[in-house]
Amino acid sequence: MNTTIRRETLPLLALDDYQLAATRYHAERPQAQLLIAGATGVPQGFYRRFAEHAASRGFNTMTLDYRGIGQSKPDSLRGFEMEYLDWAHLDLAAAVDQHRHAERPLFMIGHSFGGHAFGLLPNHDQVAGFYTFGTGAGWHGWMPKAEQVRVLAMWRVIGPLMTRYKGYLAWSKLGMGEDLPLGVYRQWKRWCRFPRYFFDDPQMPGLAERFTLGDR
């Protein structure tokens, strides 16, 4: 580990003024800015070593916890109201805005949901380049048979029972990551019904065109 990397914990206000937790990893000789957009249910600490490495390579790097996750979650997720898309429209968009006056270009890396999020950003034009990994559709039909059974059991049996009892998806009990707010669970479950994920959702018309044309 490069022990010269200075790490700074900083508050971040989402576009609706929700308080988020973020961390800045300062490069000794910064050449660019980097924003890491995390996966569903993955706290920012998971990306610490990568962020430190990026900073050692000249990127002033920011990580954040989306609302409802990590240090940005309320005392209880029961009754916590939000939508899955808030992570992109309100949280990541605010993180992008944090860099709008920076002298150096901003790049993003998106993991899983973080990869989907780039096409949902209202301020994508502020990003000079974007790399995504581990970003999939989530439809069970693309998966091997054994995985299909596990996924369908999650959506049709385990998830409904767990959310009815808890009021949120106790994801951590399954060793899958952090617990998820009910709104995230419901939208995620809905999108995974479609082969092309949210692009096929009739409640989100024109989304594919907005991704293609950059018209947010």
Give residue ranges: language-model regions:
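Active-site glycine-rich loops that stabilize anionic/oxyanionic intermediates
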Residues: 31, 36-42
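Alpha/beta-hydrolase fold nucleophile elbow
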Residues: 100-112
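Hydrolases whose catalytic domains are alpha/beta-hydrolase-1, hotdog thioesterase
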Residues: 117-121
